[in-house]
Amino acid sequence: MIEQARIEELRQKLNQYSYEYYVQDQPTVPDSTYDQLLRELTELETAHPELITPDSPTQRVGAAALDAFEKVTHDLPMLSLGNVFDETEIREWVARIERSLGRSTTYVAELKFDGLAISLKYEDGQLVRGATRGDGTVGENITQNLRTIKALPLRLRRNETVEVRGEAYMPKQSFERLNADRAAREEALFANPRNAAAGSLRQLDSSITASRNLSLFVYGVGVNTLSARSHSEAMLQLAELGLPTNKEMQTCETVEEILAYIAHWTMERSNLPYEIDGIVLKVDRYDDQEELGFTAKSPRFATAYKFAAEEVMTTVEEVDFSVGRTGKVTPRARFAPVVVAGSTVSYATLHNADFITEKDIRLHDQVIIKKAGDVIPAVVSVVVSERTGNEQPIEFPAHCPACESELVRLEGEADIRCVSPECPAQLVEGIIHFVSRQAMNIDGLGEKVVRQLYEHEAIRTLADLYRLDRDELLTYERMGETSVDNLLTAIEASKQNSLERLMFGLGIRLVGQKAAYLLAERFDSLDGIAQAEYEDILAIDGIGSKIADSVTKYFEHPEAQALIKDLAELGLNQQFLGQRVDQSNAPLAGKTIVLTGTLESLKRSEAGKRLELLGADVTGSVSKKTDILVAGEKAGSKLTKAESLGIEIWNETQLLEELAKYEG
């Protein structure tokens, strides 16, 4: 059959061109040629669906969206690695290896990719399963999403049966493009490529994953079915099979060679097209690995050196103050621009007056800054030895920088606030919060549009959003008929939201999404919440005294009462419709979770809120009732106690994986 022969020829050509482009980084044909051949193959397979095979290049995307990921038990556990943090610990690790073996040995040094660990299983050369690491023993089947990664061969170059381990990641360029697209749509940005990769691979719709331009590297075998007698030999064999391996791997005979490799990539990491967060060190020979064995959690023959956060010195040139939606006044330092962890930094938050006092930060000081988690700029310390005598204390304003009202510091709080109900900065930030996806979810009404409407005096309160005039909007810059009609349609649709969205959107201090849901569920209507006594609110499981106090005080204000009445007259639903998933059916319902230590990618408070939205009960102390402890850096006594009680422990990577899995 002529068509069958042509289809097979096209598949072979396309697979070879993909290998040259995505694995070898040496394309031999232009993109247009590849696209033309792929189009021809698609047309032939459409005409002859009986000839479609799972490893065809056309089958990377297109399966129906899943309802959930099935669980997968790894043939061999995917253990985590121990850590070393400096030269002394590296030397001690090498010495310990050689003492155990009674001789010197050869090591392999590899880049530690900052992505999501995966397992890939091939049978007779064909990809049959791809899974996440999960807890190391049980992961999730994400084969459908991994198939969309063009660097991943759907069929090996030989009919081998093998399980390999690797890391799926998002290249820096793809990450920047993704965030630029999200910013243009006024969607929340991903904090870093690792989070973006994890979230992309946990999409139930593989077409979304395909649009994210992920890639991957294979870094080892699981159950070893190869003839290789060492890790470095195995990597050569995997490359021969067409799998994407990393060319920067290096064998090392001495600790000095290991240290030189680390020093080189510490300096050069920012020049790579993908993120790395350290170096993996392994004993090369498999018989040596077998002799060294494992601890309960990790192999003795391998460890990971994690890069320290890059720190740079710069000058505090000025400090400005911004006002948030709750009136909190936040100081922000502006620096002489410096490059930190690959990008230019020119400012960082100084949090509050206590932070400034504690670190004794002054205008014109030389300060050390870093990026927390290689993402968020942060001031580490002041270089006191560089002071010249020209430094000046940072003075908090006595009056609001937005409305000139007198600022206050409430008892027991570190923050200084503007309490004026007429403060324009609070009004704008409050409206931005009100229309956000987590609150009223009004599509097309992002921060820029809100500020534009405020500048035109079209809105001054939340209620004004529902009085916007179509003809007037059409006179504004970048407001065409289609965008205006879509905006007004979205605003009108938001009137039907369930009460918990409105309650969260009001921006009451300390009332997050979970508290808003609990209040709406308990009192059924906005009037019910507004008239509730402090004791009634406090009686709700999950609502503390500070939230109860904040809610009752909010509804005592005449301005709040007038707003509620206004919104009701404009037709906004103020009843609980039960539209959100019952927390009892949430993925982490019934789980008691404690967070301890320092998290690099997000604050513990943010992590706690996100876990609560997934149904977890987040508490502050470890007990027999605790199900999971999330342990960040420098976790102390809570970690020790959790280990003694046999409680499940997540590191930060596992936390991010779980959040990405359920948040999509």
UniProtKB/Swiss-Prot annotation:
Annotated GO biological process: DNA repair; DNA replication
Ranges of residues in domain BRCT: 583-664
Residues annotated as binding Zn(2+): 400, 403, 418, 423
InterPro entries: BRCT_dom, BRCT_dom_sf, DisA/LigA_HHH, DNA_ligase, DNA_ligase_AS, DNAligase_adenylation, DNAligase_N, Hlx-hairpin-Hlx_DNA-bd_motif
EC number: 6.5.1.2
GO terms assigned for molecular function: DNA binding; DNA ligase (NAD+) activity; metal ion binding
Cofactor: Mg(2+); Mn(2+)
Keyword flag Manganese: yes
Annotated transmembrane regions: none
Gene Ontology cellular component annotations, sorted alphabetically: cytosol
Binding-site residues, NAD(+): 31-35, 80-81, 110, 133, 167, 282, 306
EC category name: ligase
Catalyses which reaction(s): NAD(+) + (deoxyribonucleotide)n-3'-hydroxyl + 5'-phospho-(deoxyribonucleotide)m = (deoxyribonucleotide)n+m + AMP + beta-nicotinamide D-nucleotide
Pfam families: BRCT, DNA_ligase_aden, DNA_ligase_OB, DNA_ligase_ZBD, HHH_2, HHH_5, Nlig-Ia
Active site: 112 (n6-amp-lysine intermediate)
Function: DNA ligase that catalyzes the formation of phosphodiester linkages between 5'-phosphoryl and 3'-hydroxyl groups in double-stranded DNA using NAD as a coenzyme and as the energy source for the reaction. It is essential for DNA replication and repair of damaged DNA.
Family recorded in the similarity comment: Belongs to the NAD-dependent DNA ligase family. LigA subfamily.
Name of the protein in question: DNA ligase
Organism annotation: Exiguobacterium sibiricum (strain DSM 17290 / CCUG 55495 / CIP 109462 / JCM 13490 / 255-15)
Lineage of the species this protein comes from: Bacteria, Bacillati, Bacillota, Bacilli, Bacillales
Gene name tied to this protein: ligA
